[in-house]
């Protein structure tokens, strides 16, 4: 940033979630520096905030080995072109938003050219492939982390990291309105309600749906009024779930929802879900939960070798203890899942204590992440 040139921030977002984060960051930066310039790889939300898109976000949003191999030449071209053009532009700061396989190498290239670099959203280095922390440390001037235990991990390796809180925690109220959510979904206020979330990936839905449905059947024996809501991320997952339900629980009445996972969590007395971001969202919705997860035996064996954490779900990692019951592999079966969910549906001491801890954890990570990220960028730009 000079008197002649406005503050110039380069950004690369690799998928929709990164576009949302990038838009929030740009908005917060514009409030402080109205004439700042933003350039890079951007989606529609970032562009709406004024980011000049050299490439569209879809160019980088590829998943799976086959897809990546099919697009490898194009990805390498974009990577080389961005290295060259950012090197010529000399932005005040480069911010790589998520997409670590693409961005961390790019950050390293730019840092060698004297450009200050930030990686926004820590990869799960604290959980597996921990040696990546050294590459990240070489490539970046600063990591922006959503969760406090991530910062503690980077501190251990003397990699500069700033805990900024989680944008999802900012977006969700500390005290969600259960009855309002039930009104939206058409669920009576005075019944018990269970949310089933068997995952967003096809393999997860295939592995978990049958056991989740059988668990719901067992629970309905105790709670005949039990309303069961099943939010599914898209039409493909819905068709898959309906096929499995027709095979294992054709007579079980459920409410299938197109999306609306957050509303389902807020409306429910308890949730049974696959691990992942859904567990964090469920915690923020203040919905007591059980995590059930199964994968192919070899994959699980490999994961046990590679994963270095005591827990798989984010609520437990945040709490540093088994706050939420995790039933994995052979433990993930209807009798055990139902036994873990029964006390939560009773709305007694167990669920109230879990709710209170969820609220405390929500407050810990509710830090206005967009503002915190913008402040970090401006401090580095000085």
Swiss-Prot record:
GO biological process: lipid A biosynthetic process
GO cellular component: membrane
One of the Pfam families matching this protein, by short name: LpxB
Keywords linked to the UniProt accession: Glycosyltransferase, Lipid A biosynthesis, Lipid biosynthesis, Lipid metabolism, Transferase
Signal sequence interval, chain numbering: none
UniProt GO molecular function: lipid-A-disaccharide synthase activity; phospholipid binding
Enzyme class: transferase
Superkingdom: Bacteria
Catalytic function, reaction form: 2-N,3-O-bis[(3R)-3-hydroxytetradecanoyl]-alpha-D-glucosaminyl 1-phosphate + UDP-2-N,3-O-bis[(3R)-3-hydroxytetradecanoyl]-alpha-D-glucosamine = lipid A disaccharide (E. coli) + UDP + H(+); a lipid X + a UDP-2-N,3-O-bis[(3R)-3-hydroxyacyl]-alpha-D-glucosamine = a lipid A disaccharide + UDP + H(+)
E.C. no: 2.4.1.182
Spans traversing the lipid bilayer: none
Coiled-coil stretches noted in the UniProt entry, renumbered to this chain: none
Pathway: Glycolipid biosynthesis; lipid IV(A) biosynthesis; lipid IV(A) from (3R)-3-hydroxytetradecanoyl-[acyl-carrier-protein] and UDP-N-acetyl-alpha-D-glucosamine: step 5/6
Physiological role: Condensation of UDP-2,3-diacylglucosamine and 2,3-diacylglucosamine-1-phosphate to form lipid A disaccharide, a precursor of lipid A, a phosphorylated glycolipid that anchors the lipopolysaccharide to the outer membrane of the cell.
Homology family: Belongs to the LpxB family.
PANTHER family: LIPID-A-DISACCHARIDE SYNTHASE, LIPID-A-DISACCHARIDE SYNTHASE, MITOCHONDRIAL-RELATED
Database matches in HAMAP family: LpxB
Entry protein name: Lipid-A-disaccharide synthase
Source species: Shigella dysenteriae serotype 1 (strain Sd197)
Primary gene name: lpxB
């Amino acid at each position: 940033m000079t008197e002649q040139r406005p503050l110039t921030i380069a950004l690369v977002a690799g998928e929709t979630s990164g576009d949302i984060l990038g838009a929030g960051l740009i908005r917060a930066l514009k409030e402080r520096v109205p004439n700042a310039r933003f350039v890079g790889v951007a989606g529609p939300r970032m562009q709406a905030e004024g980011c000049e898109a050299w490439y569209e976000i879809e160019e980088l949003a590829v998943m799976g080995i086959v897809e990546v191999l099919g697009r490898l030449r194009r990805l390498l071209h974009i990577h080389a072109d961005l290295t060259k053009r950012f090197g010529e532009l000399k932005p005040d700061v480069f911010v790589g938003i998520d997409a670590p396989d693409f961005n961390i190498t790019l950050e390293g290239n730019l840092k060698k050219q004297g450009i200050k670099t930030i990686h926004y959203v820590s990869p799960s280095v604290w959980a597996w492939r921990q040696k990546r922390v050294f590459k990240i440390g070489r490539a970046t001037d600063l990591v922006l982390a959503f969760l406090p235990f991530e910062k503690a991990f980077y501190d251990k390796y003397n990699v500069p990291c700033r805990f900024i809180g989680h944008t999802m925690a900012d977006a969700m109220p500390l005290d969600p309105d259960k009855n309002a959510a039930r009104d939206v979904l058409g669920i009576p206020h005075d019944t018990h309600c269970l949310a089933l979330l068997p995952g967003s990936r096809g393999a997860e839905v295939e592995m978990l749906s049958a056991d989740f449905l059988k668990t719901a059947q067992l629970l309905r024996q105790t709670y005949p009024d039990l309303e069961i809501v099943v939010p599914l991320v898209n039409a493909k997952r819905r068709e898959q779930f309906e096929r499995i339900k027709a095979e294992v629980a054709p007579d079980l009445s459920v409410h299938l929802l197109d999306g609306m996972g957050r509303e389902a969590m807020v409306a429910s007395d308890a949730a049974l879900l696959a691990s992942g971001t859904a567990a964090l969202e469920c915690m923020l919705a203040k919905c007591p939960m059980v995590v059930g997860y199964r994968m192919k035996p070899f994959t699980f064996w490999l994961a046990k070798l590679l994963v270095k954490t005591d827990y798989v779900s984010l609520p437990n990692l945040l709490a540093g203890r088994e706050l939420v019951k995790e039933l994995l592999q052979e433990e993930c079966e209807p009798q055990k899942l139902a036994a873990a969910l029964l006390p939560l549906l009773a709305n007694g001491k167990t669920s109230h204590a879990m709710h209170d801890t969820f609220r405390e954890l929500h407050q810990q990570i509710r830090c206005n992440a967009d503002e915190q990220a913008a402040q970090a960028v401006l401090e580095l730009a000085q």
